[in-house]
From Swiss-Prot:
GO terms for biological process: translation. It holds the Pfam family Ribosomal_L27. InterPro entries: Ribosomal_bL27, Ribosomal_bL27_CS. One of its GO terms (cellular component) is cytosolic large ribosomal subunit. Belongs to the bacterial ribosomal protein bL27 family. This is Large ribosomal subunit protein bL27.
Length: 93
């Protein structure tokens, strides 16, 4: 038998790099237009007011303002950005 099995398995030892997904700007944080708000696979969070969506489902701010996380129906979550002046009204009501 010419098989060598004494050094352990060499078929393991690989792993892929992390995708670094998740929320990048949280509720109440000030953002500028173009800031990435959420990196995601699929639409766990939906785009709300003043938020764009990229081809990989990344949500980003379209205007300068403050981030708010809101509910859209029972189960949907949406992310909106309100200009600084309007943000106080949106958070209050």
């Amino acid at each position: 038998m010419a098989h060598k099995k004494g050094t352990g398995s060499t078929r393991n030892g690989r792993d892929s790099n992390a995708q670094r997904l998740g929320v990048k700007r949280f509720g109440g944080q000030a953002v500028i237009a173009g800031n990435i708000l959420v990196r995601q696979r699929g639409t766990k969070f939906h785009a709300g007011n003043n938020v764009g969506i990229g081809k990989d489902d990344t949500l980003f701010a379209l205007v300068d303002g403050v981030v708010t996380f809101e509910r859209k129906g029972k189960s949907r979550k949406k992310v909106s950005v309100y200009p600084a002046a309007a943000a106080a009204e949106a958070v209050a009501g």
